[in-house]
Amino acid sequence: MPQAVAGPEIERLIQLLARMPGLGPRSARRAALQLIKKRDTLLGPLAEAMRVASERIVTCRECGNVDTCDPCTICRDHGRDPSMLVVVEDVSDLWALERSGAVTARYHVLGGILSALDGIRPENLNLARLVERASVPEMREIILALSATVDGQTTAHYVTELLAHLPVKVTKLAHGVPVGGELDYLDEGTLSAAIRQRTAF
């Protein structure tokens, strides 16, 4: 077992950073050193921002997004199209779609996808609230923005069946060649989907 190179407080910081996705022990150690070197301009303000976030962040009861208010900023936005709902697996997907600037609808976060392997069943997801939201008179379209994985597509089929009794159109994101993507680098599944879902030029 490697020896500690610093006091317990610094080792604790490194251990916590190493729990972050994409950060292993070595990257966590480097990040900790940068924070320590810049403790006045980075570590202190970061610690304060994290303290405030920990105290104020809540989950929106309407859509499942995280924010410092409930309903969240997106649900409060009257400029959003109330007739469309974009269903996503996780908040990170919601944020990614928001960064694209392509969505003017509201969102619904499922909180995961169905997975027999991970033991995630329908009752573990935010599905009851989805049915409630899809049932309002002004709702016209539910857009399933779920992963193109087996579990993602299984979830999409389940949601489609769940909403089949409602007078709403259920659509899904197109799959295919990404903007700027070269065919040589794409996998067979992506190329196959791109051919099947081709559009007029």
Curated annotation (Swiss-Prot):
PROSITE patterns registered for this protein in UniProt: RECR, TOPRIM
Zinc finger feature spans (C4-type): 60-75
Pfam family, one: Toprim_4
One annotated GO biological process: DNA repair
Stored PANTHER family: RECOMBINATION PROTEIN RECR
HAMAP family: RecR (MF_00017)
Task performed by this protein: May play a role in DNA repair. It seems to be involved in an RecBC-independent recombinational process of DNA repair. It may act with RecF and RecO.
Official protein name in the record: Recombination protein RecR
Lineage: Bacteria, Pseudomonadati, Pseudomonadota, Alphaproteobacteria, Hyphomicrobiales
